[in-house]
């Protein structure tokens, strides 16, 4: 009987699993990324790719019932589908098997207040961009991160794209000469028909300064353009 040929992804998976022998997976929880969240699905998928994380707890919606229902649909223990992030930080810190890392997938206006109680309990943070809604919050966040000596990672997803890495390599090697001018555009049209289209209305918080800070769309979307500029050059 012919031996089945393993695909490259399968071999890569096995290599990573071999590296993990004797190591426990990092227990991770999420705040945000609920039923209608595109980025929430992406983060949960990414956490499974290299088999190094175990998703065990979360808060997924401001609506308590919706949050619990969604959490259990993902296979979580009902006791670890929390009503709010503060309760989650408190309860997880009491568990011997509590979370070691937290993924934050909420509007930026909530990033600081969500991260703070977890950092104070020595939980490492993986947060969506932008860092915070205001500079003052960013400065305060930096201080507590340094005080508690945890890892705070800010996700900029486009830096993983192969074409961007190729562009970065070309520029670093000087193949196009000295870069004198950079023009970055990041067009999106989701606000068109925002009152009528359900998929658009889900994102209307980006136009609410109470949810994403005074910069609103400039920080939420503009941060992609700024990061692309800095990363590639």
Positions of predicted regions on the chain:
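Hydrophobic residues in well-ordered beta-strands that form the structural core
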Residues: 127, 133, 152-154, 183
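Rossmann-fold dehydrogenase core element
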Residues: 140-158, 178-181
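N-terminal Rossmann-like dinucleotide-binding module
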Residues: 2-76
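Contiguous beta-strand/loop segments that form the cofactor/metal-binding neighborhood of enzyme cores
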Residues: 1-25, 193, 200, 220-233
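Predominantly a Rossmann-like dinucleotide-binding segment in NAD(P)-dependent oxidoreductases
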Residues: 159-233
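Beta-loop-alpha module in the N-terminal Rossmann-like domain of NAD(P)-dependent dehydrogenases
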Residues: 80-144
């Amino acid at each position: 009987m012919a031996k089945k040929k393993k695909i490259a992804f399968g071999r890569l998976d096995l290599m990573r699993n071999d590296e993990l022998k004797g190591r426990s997976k990092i227990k991770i929880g999420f705040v945000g990324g609920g039923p209608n969240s595109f980025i929430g699905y992406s983060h949960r998928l990414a956490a499974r790719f290299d088999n190094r994380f175990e998703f065990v707890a979360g808060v997924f919606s401001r609506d308590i019932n919706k949050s619990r229902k969604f959490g259990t649909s993902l296979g979580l223990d009902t006791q670890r589908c929390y009503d709010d992030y503060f309760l989650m930080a408190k309860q997880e810190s009491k568990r011997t098997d509590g979370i070691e890392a937290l993924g934050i997938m909420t509007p930026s206006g909530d990033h600081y207040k969500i991260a703070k109680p977890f950092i104070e309990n020595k939980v490492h943070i993986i947060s969506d961009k932008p860092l915070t809604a205001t500079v003052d919050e960013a400065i305060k966040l930096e201080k507590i991160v340094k005080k508690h000596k945890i890892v705070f990672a800010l996700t900029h997803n486009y830096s993983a794209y192969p074409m961007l890495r190729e562009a970065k390599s070309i520029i670093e090697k000087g193949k196009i000469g000295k870069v004198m001018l950079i023009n970055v555009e990041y067009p999106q049209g989701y606000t068109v028909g925002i009152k009528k289209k359900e998929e658009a209305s889900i994102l209307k918080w980006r136009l609410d300064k109470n949810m994403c800070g005074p910069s609103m769309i400039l920080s939420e979307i503009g941060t992609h353009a700024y990061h692309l500029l800095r990363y590639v050059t």
